């Protein structure tokens, strides 16, 4: 019997074993460091990950102290010897910018929303320290009809 070689990737400098359920960097990080380590907006078990919102971006180097690349962790496969960085000033600024852009197309008066205090966007914005956005002229959404063409999406969209 030959023992299989353990496959390891590094999260913020610490080694972790890559398991069979670690199909993406996001799943890998969540399994060891919890749900909140990398923020997400479009991560949902009922949807295939495709990196649309980019809030889950992390930096990855293919070797220790090598050059890094920013990737969407939800759809980037975890690989042996990857060095994954979950938070730094650049990533925080990127995430804040993305969420601020999303907020420009979102009603800012959360008190009137039916999901106030139970809203993923509100939670991520608060976690990133966003209380207001710097982009002017947000859409007002007054009179905008809800898209009711699919029941699952209807349960996610609260305008």
Question: Predicted segment positions?
Answer:
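Short solvent-exposed loop/turn micro-motifs enriched in small/polar/acidic residues
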Residues: 1-2, 67
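Eukaryote-biased recognition of intrinsically disordered, low-complexity regulatory segments
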Residues: 3-14
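Short glycine-/small-residue-rich flexible loop motifs, especially phosphate/cofactor-binding loops
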Residues: 6, 26-30, 122
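Residues at alpha-helix termini
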Residues: 11, 31-32, 127
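N-terminal cofactor/phosphate-binding cores enriched in small/glycine residues
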Residues: 16-70, 76-80
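Extended hydrophobic/Leu-rich segments
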Residues: 25, 157-158
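Fe-S ferredoxin-like electron-transfer domains
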Residues: 54, 59-157
